[in-house]
């Protein structure tokens, strides 16, 4: 349902005169990063985080990617939505597709201050969420930087039906596939993410 929610959200925002920077399919941390990097007034991620496929919603951040919650603006947004009385719009906002992932990858690479003396083998479990494409971009960046890391991908392609189960690595029953892959491939470690990859579990 994310695409339908995103379409409706963009339509509502632009009809109110808001310009929308469309990042495409991203993870929550990428939205936080882009909101600050692009000096946007706010950011919205369409996500149900680590919940099952029939859930969905929005995560909101304000200036400087500060989270918006009940104690700093969310209740006011709720009240405005419930009143459903908005001033007429002078102009419709625009939609500006933008790929901020290269900047995000470069920011991650700046955290690497040393290079392993041998190739690190990492099992990476995207849980059929949005981590898969981001990991591919990170993998390319690591190769360009000459950092010897090998990703062993499982449940990699985004699929909102989550055929491998709810993408919540905090649940013990969802850890087995990553654990077994680490053993099978003699990996140095494994990492499993939730659906919008703002939380992870290390093996």
Would you name each region that the model predicts?
Residues 56-185:
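Gly/Ser/Thr-enriched, mixed-charge loops and adjacent short helices
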Residues 1-55, 138-202:
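N-terminal small/polar loop signature for handling phosphorylated ligands or for N-terminal nucleophile
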């Amino acid at each position: 349902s994310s695409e339908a929610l995103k379409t409706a959200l963009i339509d509502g925002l632009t009809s109110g005169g808001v310009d929308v920077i469309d990042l495409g399919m991203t993870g929550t941390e990428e939205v936080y990063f882009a909101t600050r990097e692009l000096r946007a007034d706010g950011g919205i991620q369409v996500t149900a985080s680590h919940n099952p496929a029939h859930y969905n919603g929005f995560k909101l951040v304000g200036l400087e990617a500060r989270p918006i919650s009940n104690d700093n603006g969310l209740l006011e947004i709720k009240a405005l939505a419930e009143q459903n009385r908005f001033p007429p719009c002078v102009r419709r906002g625009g939609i500006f597709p933008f790929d901020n992932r290269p900047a995000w990858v470069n920011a991650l690479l700046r955290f690497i201050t040393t290079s392993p003396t041998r190739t690190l083998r990492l099992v990476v479990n995207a849980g059929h969420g949005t981590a898969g494409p981001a990991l591919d971009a990170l993998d390319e960046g690591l190769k360009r930087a000459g950092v010897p890391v090998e990703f062993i991908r499982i449940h990699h392609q985004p699929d909102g039906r989550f055929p491998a189960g709810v993408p919540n690595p905090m649940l013990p029953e969802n850890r087995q596939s990553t654990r077994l892959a680490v053993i099978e491939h003699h990996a140095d470690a494994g990492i499993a993410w939730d659906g919008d990859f703002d939380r992870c579990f290390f093996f």
